[in-house]
Amino acid sequence: MTDTSRASLKALQRGRDWIWITGNHDPEPAENIGGRFAQVLAIGPLTFRHEPSTQPCDGEIAGHLHPLARVARRGRSVSRRCFASDGLRLVMPAFGAYAGGLNVRDRAIASLFGALSFTAHMLGERRIYAFAAAQCLSD
């Protein structure tokens, strides 16, 4: 991490209780980046973890699968990072340059919600677009 990036991170952390959720990309806490580290964090009705539980888990917010959705619009296919959620659990997209994406129609994501009963919240340039999972295209 560059000195400039470290200074920016420290500025964001100032006055906050900063908690990093660790995962397979960073099994050991990084040094000198501030904050606390946890594999799982429960705050009230919410549970934050890197990898989604294979069991139903209301209030779960996870990553790991890096969902992306592909939809047909105006005669072409558009693929974008997305949040996948059924209102009870949420799988977040990857925002880093090194992480790819997994289609929301892939079994690893779709099986978390059952019967394609979730919404893909696609990230646009200026807003978020919601698509029912059934509207999303497979690879």
Regions inferred by a protein language model and the residue ranges of each:
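Core catalytic region of metal-dependent phosphoesterases/phosphodiesterases
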Residues: 1-41
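Short, surface-exposed, charged loop/turn segments at secondary-structure junctions
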Residues: 5, 34-38, 62-66, 75-82
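Solvent-exposed alpha-helices and their adjacent loops that cap or buttress functional pockets
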Residues: 13, 41, 53-54, 82-84
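Active-site neighborhood of phospho(di)ester-bond hydrolases with catalytic His/Asp-centered motifs
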Residues: 18-24, 48-49, 60-66, 92-94
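Active-site environment of divalent metal-dependent phosphoester hydrolases
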Residues: 24-31, 54-57, 66-71, 98-102
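Generic preference for hydrophobic
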Residues: 37, 48, 120-122
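Core dinuclear metal-dependent hydrolase active-site scaffold
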Residues: 39-61
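Acidic, His/Gly-rich catalytic cores of divalent-metal-dependent hydrolytic chemistry
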Residues: 69-139
